[in-house]
Amino acid sequence: MANNFITNAQQRSLKDRIQLLIKYSQELKFLVGFFYFSGWRELYESLKARNDIKLKILVGLDTDLHLGKVFEIDDPKAIHSSQQELVGRFFASLRIALKDESLDTQEFYEQVDFFLNLLEEGRLQIRKTFDPNHAKLYLFLLDSEGQSLVNAPGRFITGSSNLTRSGLLGQNEFNVEIGDYGWE
């Protein structure tokens, strides 16, 4: 029986699995509570290698800057805010987080440029949930080669990992990959 559990321990990191699935995917859809640029950085090379891939990210919480570190917050004002206000606050908090000095490197600027190009080309969409949401779900719609390898139109991973460096490889997590359910 195949081991579908991904724990970030002993050569079973979510980063490695997502990178492999990106190689065989035509579209990615991620629902995450936290979206740090540290997670984007971990997937950058894999995404850059696919000039045709589309990515949709739905973020359930905001980002903010605290003591020189990026972290996410559950905004209590969200209950009384319009979708436009939520999106505005999310991108404002992202701008603050991106001004952190630890991100002031040439590599980071190249990654941001790639990120912005994906947005401009319509290959990347980032949206904010109306209500706070801490769920984690990674959907992979496979290309024809990927479908023939796993005999399924897609795969999904759900569990505890956010789209952060820690969630992708830095700390113990528990995720499960499923491919035989929910694709019809």
Where are each of the predicted segments found?
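PLD/PLD-like phosphodiesterase catalytic module centered on the HKD motif
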Residues: M1-E184
